[in-house]
Amino acid sequence: MPVRAQRIQHVMQDTIINFYSTSDDYGDFSNFAAWPIKVDGKTWPTSEHYFQAQKFLDEKYREEIRRVSSPMVAARMGRDRSKPLRKNWESVKEQVMRKALRAKFEQHAELRALLLATAPAKLVEHTENDAYWGDGGHGKGKNRLGYLLMELREQLAIEK
């Protein structure tokens, strides 16, 4: 999937970059964006597939999530509470997200360039659907995905 070249060359005029839908200008930052990642020897269709699968210890169910056709289906499977969540999920979910994001932005040079080009803007997953990973739609959410992307951006700039 090509990154829109005009975004990479875009001179940052705003201090906040909102993203959410994969069709938005910065939609490639979404975990639903169709950028495959390779983690621990397996290829995942999206970072959403990887993240949702890591909620479970059942290897068979994790593999089912990896093989589904869309990130929306993977997200739905990740919310299935008939399957037991791993007990330490709340304490490891940000670590899992960091691993997914690092894989995504290290394995796709054009995405890495896009992320680096956003500095020093604040990145915000702008959605009413999530007040933990996003801003809750009103700016009062935790925006953890945005903060993890900014953290990764800093690390990649140092490693450059």
UniProtKB/Swiss-Prot annotation:
Any GO BP: riboflavin biosynthetic process
Gene3D superfamilies recorded: YbiA-like
InterPro entries recorded: NADAR, YbiA-like_sf
KW Hydrolase (keyword) present: yes
Catalysed reactions, as listed in the record: 2,5-diamino-6-hydroxy-4-(5-phosphoribosylamino)-pyrimidine + H2O = 2,5,6-triamino-4-hydroxypyrimidine + D-ribose 5-phosphate; 5-amino-6-(5-phospho-D-ribosylamino)uracil + H2O = 5,6-diaminouracil + D-ribose 5-phosphate
EC number(s) given by UniProt: 3.2.2.-
Gene null: resulting phenotype: Strongly represses cell swarming but no effect on cell swimming. Cells lacking this gene show significantly reduced FAD and FMN levels (both by 13%).
Effect in UniProt of substituting residue 89 to A: Large decrease in enzymatic activity
Single GO molecular function: hydrolase activity, hydrolyzing N-glycosyl compounds
Function per UniProt: Catalyzes the hydrolysis of the N-glycosidic bond in the first two intermediates of riboflavin biosynthesis, which are highly reactive metabolites, yielding relatively innocuous products. Thus, can divert a surplus of harmful intermediates into relatively harmless products and pre-empt the damage these intermediates would otherwise do. Helps maintain flavin levels. May act on other substrates in vivo. Has no activity against GTP, nucleoside monophosphates or ADP-ribose. Is Required for swarming motility.
Family of this protein: Belongs to the YbiA family.
Protein name (database record): N-glycosidase YbiA
Organism lineage string: Bacteria, Pseudomonadati, Pseudomonadota, Gammaproteobacteria, Enterobacterales
Gene symbol of the encoding locus: ybiA
